[in-house]
Amino acid sequence: MTTATVNATSNVPDTKLGRLYEEHIRLILAKDIEAILDQYTDDAVLISSFEKKPRYFRGRKQLREHFQGILGIEGLESKIAFWAETQNPETLMVVEAIAMQTADGEASMRFADSWVLKGGKIAIHFAGMTQYPDGSVA
């Protein structure tokens, strides 16, 4: 199992949402799906473009299905290219340059994540791929 460190992220602000984001990345590296799910509301919705078509995941059971994909990640570095957050409502928009190790080798891509929080937990998560590992742009 990969050892998670805060060094997996760079350029993350020292804010409440910055700490939640760093914890999210740490939990991904630790492959702790249950703890990741605890960051979400029970009725959370995640919309993903990772597969070049929209996928919708609603509730804990479907979110678990989405996060099963992290089990193949052996390393992850996230460098923040853009960060914006608000406090009321509590929201986050982040664009990340990602490098990771998978069973197929090293992959580099760009993600764009947006979170809407309710009660300190993620209620809506837009998980978008903006540049795929093959270099194509979404």
Residue ranges and their predicted role:
Residues 79-85, 97-99, 110-116:
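Hydrophobic/aromatic beta-strand elements that line small-molecule binding cavities or substrate pockets
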Residues 14, 33-90:
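A solvent-exposed, acidic/Ser-Thr-rich amphipathic alpha-helical stretch
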Residues 40-41, 98-100, 128-129:
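Short beta-strand segments enriched in hydrophobic/aromatic residues
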Residues 1-38, 42, 136-138:
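Short, low-complexity N-terminal intrinsically disordered segments enriched in polar/charged residues
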Residues 54-56, 106-110:
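Short, mixed charged/polar active-site loops
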